[in-house]
Amino acid sequence: MIALARDVQEFPDAYQAERARRPGVSEKGIGHALRRMNISYKKTLRHPKADEDKRHTFQETIKAYKAQNRVIVYSDESGFAHDMPRTHGYAPIGKRCHGVFNWHARGRVNVIGALISKCLLTVGLFKSNIDADTFFGWTIQDLLPKLPPASVVVMDNATFHKRQDIQNAITQAGHTLEYLPAYSPHLNPIEHKWAQAKAIRKQQNQTVEQLFKIESFYVT
């Protein structure tokens, strides 16, 4: 058991056959032993360019802001396709399930949002692609008027987020701007809100405009 635990630690993503080959035992035997040791098969992929030190520094920085009772506001963009094709359905065994797909329902609505805790502070909907000008306009007209005083605004390090007039608008309004470390979307909780919104839209068969009228999404 000790040798197997060491093997798992050294080769966490080895295939069962590879793990069995080293000590010369069967794959089935390795499988039983792993279950007895409460070791399960899973994997978390990490971007090869991600910097764990920078991620740690960012998390400590956010923790320090929270200790000062600063409001953390996470911002991000996402896209919502107009069509929501139902790729699977029910039919008697042995028979096909046929559906209808609107091949002309193309395009998407792009959204920019800001999140406080687990609730949206504001959302902007755009039929065009989001670029620096669009983001600047949303920041000035929508985000800044709604931010609590001395907020900490967090966004990813997309090039257009770093345009000087966007940075100036936020900091000159008395807020602090922080950028996520590269390749670290999991550190932005608004990503989970977008996933939740897309799941609800599919369940309730709503348009994007209807979806973002749901009051429970927002800060009250």
Regions found by a protein language model. Give the residues of each.
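Short functional hotspots at interaction and active-site rims
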Residues: 1-220
